Each structure stands twice: as structure tokens, then as C-alpha cells.
Amino acid sequence: MFARTFTVVVAVLCLVGTTAFAQPQSAEPSSVILFENVRIFDGKSDTLSGSMNVLVRGNTIDRISKDPIPTDRSANTKIIAGGGRTLMPGLIDMHWHTMLVRPTVAALLAGDIGYLNLMAGAEATDTLMRGFTTVRDMGGPAFGLKRAIDEGTIPGPRIYPSGAIITVTSGHGDFRQPFEVPRVLGAPQSRGEQTGAAMVADSPDEVRVRVREQLLLGATQVKLTAGGGVASPHSPLDASTFTEAELRAAVEAAENWGTYVAVHAYTPISIQRAIAAGVKCIEHGHLMDEQTAKLIAEKGIWLSTQAFPDEMADAFPPGSLERAKAFEVFAGTDRTFALAKKYRIKTAFGTDILFSPRLAPRQGELLAKLVRWYTPAETLAMATGTNAELLALSGKRNPYLGKLGVIEHGALADVLLVDGDPIANIKLIEDPAKNFVVIMKDGKIFKNTL
């Protein structure tokens, strides 16, 4: 229902105009695009290249050369004079909630579905215009929006959807009200379940069903909540939710489809139990201890974590339990990144912006905050080449054939032309409207101010 509703309302919007969305130019369908005289950040290196030329043919990078690249200079060829600017891969946010960025919790649980979809569509366009050409959606009904973007109905980033967050009764993501308890098998689903935001599962068998449902709908990976969370009113941070057997059931179901499970987890016990069950990626980890960090490193588990700003707590009322939990998590940020660096944990960058249209425009700023722990080059590499490595864990469930996060021959042409050197001045990414002069996704130009 969510996907059908979204398709209808977006089609109507296209008929009456698109003033509700940010205003990228129409994607230019040139079959050959040549960037001349650019310095390249390739998504891996510590420094920029010298002056180079990059040829994009169709949706892939066809040639990179320090020598001039000849073209037929026909109407199908577009030449972009780089003027020594930086060409870099499009940014990747590994913990995004496409449908949950702008609405309040109350609007999500009680608002009109068509309205929520239109808000998400507008935010998707703005996300692309901030230079984030790919997001990994870590919970919510993003399948319809992904389809609309992929079909060209609306501009937006590539989406790797997880589908509904899978939780337990009383777990993070169970937004039922007290009058909705007890949960009766066969009874109508809660509002959160009806929208596809979250699904409750209370046994290994139920977990298998819920995981398989999300895979049927098109999930590229699956997310479970292994412990308590900030936004859920009945889920204390110290709580461990799924049993190891339940988590293992999810892992087996996902592996049968050639993909992996990521879990929301803050505490040592939640993280350790998930790793024992075969989970491949920990989301957050802000309250982990040194022993747990060692285990993550030894097992080669991914840590997808965030440098939360204090303003993120503004989504919750002053004096609320949720707000208090938020600051408890924020206090662990510095230690989390320090442990990740100390033990060389495979670390991915994401923002996890929720219920805050004011914070969403600061997506690049949250990336730039990582220079507190990493060099600018390491920070940019994390948000491009490193994040793309984690995306590749989805295996054959990967919806986008080709390599992301790098500037190299054969890679998908998701690139940004930056007016300056972001390694020397990473704050350039905080103002994409000014400093990202070209935004290209899948070989199509969505912004060109040159």
C-alpha cells in the first residue's frame, strides 16, 4: 500500500508542478561527458592527484588520463572545464532513514500516509543536492521511494533499503501505546506495522517470517534492534531484546538470500550477543566497552556509527525520558571513535538524522565533525570508498550493478565537482549549495553551476 500510494501522489505532483521540492536542474542525459583539468580524490588516497581528465560514458567512468582525451565533440558530448577543481565520488550515508527525517513521531504514527511520502520525496531530492548520491536506509518503508527515484520519477539518491525495522515486544521500534497491549496473534497490526516502519517478532519462527517479508519486498540487508533505543518511549538503553536464537534465525534467513543482518545496539551485552549470532554490522555502539571493541575487531565486524550533535535531542521534549537517553548516548561518542581507531575497527559513517527537518541540511557538517578523530582524507574516504565496501556486503541483493564510492575506470559515475580542495579544507562539504558546482549520479548531471 505504501509503495502504491507514493507512486500515485508523486505522479499527481509531477502533473501540477514540483515547487514543493528542492530545485535541481533536469538530469542531463548526455551519453558522453568529459571533465577536463580536474584534481581527483579517488575515495581511497590521502592526497589529490595532479591535473587529470575523466571521461564518463553512459553511467560509468570510461577513462582517466593526465593526457587530453579526444572526443568527437558532437551534440552527444558535454565538456566540463574543471579549472583545477576537485572531482570526488558522491558521498554515502550509511545510516539514513529516508521516510523518517522530516516528520515528528506523532506525525509518523498518526499522519496521512500520502503527506508523509511527499515529505520523504522532497527530502530525497534535497539529500541528493547535498552531494549524498547513495544512502543505506536503516529502517522504514522506503521501497516505493526507491522505485520512484530509480525510475526517474523524482530526483534522489540511490537507496539500499532495509525495510521495516524488526523488533520485539517492548523493544526499540515498538511504538505501540499501552492500550494496544497485549499483542494478540491474528489481531490487526499496530500503526507502525501498518506503515511498514517496524515489525514485531517474538520468537525465532516469527523473526524468520519478518526477515523473509522484508527480503520479498526488496530489502538489500535487514535490520533488527538488539537493544534499547532513544526514540522508543518503552525501551530502556540497557535492555537486551532479541535472544541469541532469535538473532541467529534472522542471520540464517538473510544469508539464505545472500545478504546480511545489521543490528541497532549500544551496550556490550547487546553487541556481543549479536556477534555470537553471526551479525555482520553493528549500528551505533556508543556505550560499548574495550572488551567489546576488541571482539568487534577480532571478528572483522563492521561498526556503523555516528557523531551525534547535541541538537539531535531537540526532537524530544525537555525533561522527557527520550531526551535524557539521547544525552546518555551522546556522551559515549568520543570513546566509541577512540576505540574504533585504537583497534582499527572497520568503521562506516552515517548520520541517523530523525524527526528533524532542521538538522537534515547539516548532513555534510556531521561528516566534517569526524576530523575530531580522523584526518580529512580519512573522513572523506570513510564516506565514499569505505562505505561502499559495506554496501557490497549485500551481495546479489545489491540493486546497483557496478562499483560505488571511487573514481576509477569502470566505476559507476556518481561524482561531485568541488570548488576547492576538500582535503585541505573539509568545511567545503558543509555548504554544498555553494561548493558542489556539479553533482552527477549514474552518469546524469543533476546540478551544474559552471
Residue ranges and their predicted role:
Residues S26, I40, K44-M88:
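Histidine-rich, glycine-flanked metal-binding segment
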Residues V38, V54, N59, G84, ...:
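Divalent metal-coordination and catalytic microenvironments
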Residues S162, T169, L224-R335, K346-A348, ...:
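Active-site core of metal-dependent hydrolases
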Residues V105-L118, Q189-V209, Y260-A262:
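Active-site mouth loops of central-metabolism enzymes
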Residues A20-P29:
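Boundary at the C-terminal end of the N-terminal hydrophobic targeting segment
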Residues N256, F330-P422:
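His/Asp/Glu-enriched, well-ordered alpha-helical/loop segment
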